[in-house]
């Protein structure tokens, strides 16, 4: 696994020494040797690499990585260029268009958001090929909870976008009055029509950031 080497390291270094993480590290390393896992090992911590702690303005929480070949690259909801856009991201783009008038791109790579301060964090960072949730409960949740708590302790304006019940369960960890929590149903085709569409998370996020003197996010993904 590629090491975290920016300011997230200081925030999370205590986790690396805990028994659960040592067991997690051993389990994941062994499975990368003996099974097909996603994302590629070097991409596991991409969300942290691309969005240092001091630059985080927005947090979007996902669950576990995409589990088909070539999709996952360490950012929740995002896929590499050249890969079919997954249904949930199709709906995110639709809401982005309806909310801000952004042009819908022909790819699903959201790196531009991450580089502007949108931490796109799955709560579980690895998955076995073609087996959704196969690494749930092996330790990643404890690790990403530590990241969420580190974010909660930051006193600058941060927006937490929580789509769906699993993400919304993390709201109990968020009690900083300087932050904004936006909740909506998951953008999955199974639930998007229950209130995800029309929730306007992108404009609400930028309005909150601007009110706090923070430069808003340019949500337009390059075409």
Q: What function would you assign to each model-found segment?
A:
Residues 196:
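C-terminal substrate-binding/active-site "lid" region of AdoMet-derived donor-dependent transferases
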Residues 199-200:
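Polytopic transmembrane helical bundles with strong interfacial aromatic enrichment
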């Amino acid at each position: 696994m590629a090491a975290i080497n920016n300011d997230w390291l200081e925030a999370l270094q205590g986790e690396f020494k805990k028994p659960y993480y040592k067991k997690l590290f051993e389990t994941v390393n062994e499975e990368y040797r003996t099974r097909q896992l996603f994302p590629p090992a070097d991409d596991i911590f991409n969300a942290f690499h691309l969005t240092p702690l001091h630059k985080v303005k927005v947090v979007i929480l996902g669950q576990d990585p995409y589990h088909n070949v070539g999709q996952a690259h360490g950012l929740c909801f995002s896929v590499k260029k050249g890969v079919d856009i997954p249904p949930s991201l199709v709906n995110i783009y639709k809401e982005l268009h309806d909310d801000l008038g952004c042009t819908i791109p022909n790819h699903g790579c959201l790196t531009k958001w991450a580089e502007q301060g949108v931490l796109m964090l799955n709560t579980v960072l690895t998955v076995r090929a073609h087996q959704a949730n196969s690494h749930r409960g092996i330790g990643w949740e404890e690790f990403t909870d530590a990241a969420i708590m580190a974010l909660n302790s930051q006193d600058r304006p941060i927006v937490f976008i929580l789509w769906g019940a699993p993400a919304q369960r993390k709201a109990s960890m968020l009690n900083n009055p300087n932050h904004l929590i936006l909740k909506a149903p998951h953008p999955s085709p199974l639930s998007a029509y229950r209130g995800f569409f029309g929730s306007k998370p992108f404009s609400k996020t930028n309005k909150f950031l601007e009110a706090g003197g923070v430069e808003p996010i340019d949500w337009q993904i390059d075409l």
